[in-house]
């Protein structure tokens, strides 16, 4: 049988059959997988026995190391305007990793009711053609257009603590109902966010993870950093040298610097890139 890993607890794997959405709890990895030091992660497609072991892990289309998730269709990046205050550096940290993995991104900007200047803070990202939705936490409404974007996809949720991820999941998936159903099936008590897991309702699936503190870009190589951002990939093809890091090179030799000079890349995005590059050089990831 083929299924997808939706949760891992203490070496046991919960697998869902994608055809009928039936849950198969408490599976273990086979001896062959353990011999090869291979372990499934949340999001993996696997072959399994109904009351036994996971026998095979299928090739992943993408993967994050921290948190360990695979086969993401798109990432929902939460960022708040206030409480906590908006930070382009933090937002670009998330985007650096996600775009390096070629994962499509939707930006969900929360707490817009706390600052009337919220749209100006995101102007650079609008100019870079990011898909952005503004969320008013007081209204507790989810745009119909956003629901359409999320349907029939595996959506990875990431964002700083306190930006409204939990409220969104509760509101969007009726989380209490979904988790109660799973808890009764597995007899595991109430849900906590100490584990990465896929929560679903009807045609919507969201990867719930412990929080942004475990989100790491240490897995990205120096070569990936220089062309990680989607907009950098677009203009780096105009660089004279394939090894260009868009830093010490002359403007006429660097496609990124020319795009920056022409206003096609926001100055703040370039400054954040230099910050990440400097962190890499200091090995302080």
Swiss-Prot record:
Cellular component terms (Gene Ontology): cytoplasm
Enzyme type, top EC level: hydrolase
UniProtKB keywords: Cytoplasm, GTP-binding, Hydrolase, Metal-binding, Nucleotide-binding, Ribosome biogenesis, RNA-binding, rRNA-binding, Zinc
Domain (CP-type G) ranges: 61-215
Example GO biological process: ribosomal small subunit biogenesis
InterPro entries hit by this protein: G_CP_dom, NA-bd_OB-fold, P-loop_NTPase, Ribosome_biogen_GTPase_RsgA, RsgA_GTPase_dom, RsgA_N
Superkingdom, taxonomy of origin: Bacteria
E.C. number: 3.6.1.-
GO molecular function: GTP binding; GTPase activity; metal ion binding; rRNA binding
Record's function text: One of several proteins that assist in the late maturation steps of the functional core of the 30S ribosomal subunit. Helps release RbfA from mature subunits. May play a role in the assembly of ribosomal proteins into the subunit. Circularly permuted GTPase that catalyzes slow GTP hydrolysis, GTPase activity is stimulated by the 30S ribosomal subunit.
Subunit details: Monomer. Associates with 30S ribosomal subunit, binds 16S rRNA.
Name of this protein: Small ribosomal subunit biogenesis GTPase RsgA
């Amino acid at each position: 049988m083929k299924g997808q890993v939706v949760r891992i607890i203490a070496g046991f794997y919960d697998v869902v059959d994608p055809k009928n959405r039936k849950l198969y709890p408490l599976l273990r990895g086979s001896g062959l997988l353990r011999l090869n030091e291979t372990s499934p992660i949340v999001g993996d497609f696997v072959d399994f026995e109904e009351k036994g072991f996971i026998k095979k892990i299928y090739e992943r289309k993408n993967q994050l190391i921290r948190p360990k998730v695979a086969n993401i269709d798109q990432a929902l990046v939460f960022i708040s305007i206030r409480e906590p205050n908006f930070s382009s550096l933090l937002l670009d940290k998330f985007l650096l990793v996600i775009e390096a993995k070629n994962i499509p991104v939707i930006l969900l900007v929360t707490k817009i009711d706390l600052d009337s200047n919220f749209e100006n803070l995101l102007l650079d990202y609008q100019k870079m053609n990011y898909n952005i939705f503004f969320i008013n936490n007081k209204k507790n409404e989810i745009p119909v257009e956003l629901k359409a974007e999320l349907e029939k996809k595996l959506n990875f949720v990431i964002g700083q603590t306190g930006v409204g991820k939990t409220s969104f999941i509760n509101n969007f998936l009726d989380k209490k109902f979904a988790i109660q159903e799973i808890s009764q099936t597995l007899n595991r008590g109430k849900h906590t966010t100490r584990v990465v897991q896929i929560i679903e309702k009807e045609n919507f699936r969201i990867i719930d993870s412990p929080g942004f503190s475990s989100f790491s870009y240490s897995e990205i190589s120096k070569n990936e950093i220089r062309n990680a951002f989607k907009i950098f990939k677009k203009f780096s093809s105009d660089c004279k040298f394939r090894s260009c890091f868009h830093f010490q090179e002359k403007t006429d030799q660097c496609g990124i610097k020319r795009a920056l000079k022409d206003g096609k890349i926001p100055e703040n995005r370039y400054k954040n890139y230099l910050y990440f590059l400097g962190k890499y050089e200091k090995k302080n990831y």
